């Protein structure tokens, strides 16, 4: 059975389409109209090694919050659909990723339960990257977790510069996601018998 999904989310603020194939290579440059966010979505696709296509528009004349959050929501919905009953997946993934002075650690559980623990919000991260801050990243990941049924822990072990923090976290998230969606058995990875 193909592990694919296509989801569109349209509101008065945004119009986002995500196509996802968990067993294919990345296929398109993201196109949301926000340069740095597109760069991060490209990193997500490349480092997860998943077939991810994201396009959309948003009210960037106000600020990027709605676009970034709604993209996380839509990606989470697409992942949940593509995983189906989650039978056979590894379920867990984790990764450490350095970027210059920054070191990020991300741990992911595709448990069906939504939770985000996002340490960088309690730290003194400074600056932004093309108008994207670590707070925007938090909202992207929160939207993803809430709609994918995922538990995600994000720790920052070193670094405070926003560009490097965002990029290291996004790449660590991608690598954890790659491992968690991998099919490694034919059983459901739960002692409860359901996820």
From Swiss-Prot:
Listed EC numbers: 4.2.1.19
Enzyme class label: lyase
Any Pfam family matching the protein: IGPD
Broad class of the protein's primary localization: cytoplasm
Localization annotation: Cytoplasm
PROSITE patterns membership: IGP_DEHYDRATASE_1, IGP_DEHYDRATASE_2
Keyword Endoplasmic reticulum (UniProt): no
Entries under InterPro entries matching the protein: IGPD_sf (IPR038494), ImidazoleglycerolP_deHydtase (IPR000807), ImidazoleglycerP_deHydtase_CS (IPR020565), Ribosomal_Su5_D2-typ_SF (IPR020568)
Keywords: Amino-acid biosynthesis, Cytoplasm, Histidine biosynthesis, Lyase
Any single GO CC term annotated in Swiss-Prot or TrEMBL for this entry: cytoplasm
Pathway: Amino-acid biosynthesis; L-histidine biosynthesis; L-histidine from 5-phospho-alpha-D-ribose 1-diphosphate: step 6/9
Reactions the enzyme catalyzes: D-erythro-1-(imidazol-4-yl)glycerol 3-phosphate = 3-(imidazol-4-yl)-2-oxopropyl phosphate + H2O
UniProt keyword Amino-acid biosynthesis present: yes
GO BP, sorted A to Z: L-histidine biosynthetic process
Family membership noted in the UniProt record: Belongs to the imidazoleglycerol-phosphate dehydratase family.
Protein known as: Imidazoleglycerol-phosphate dehydratase
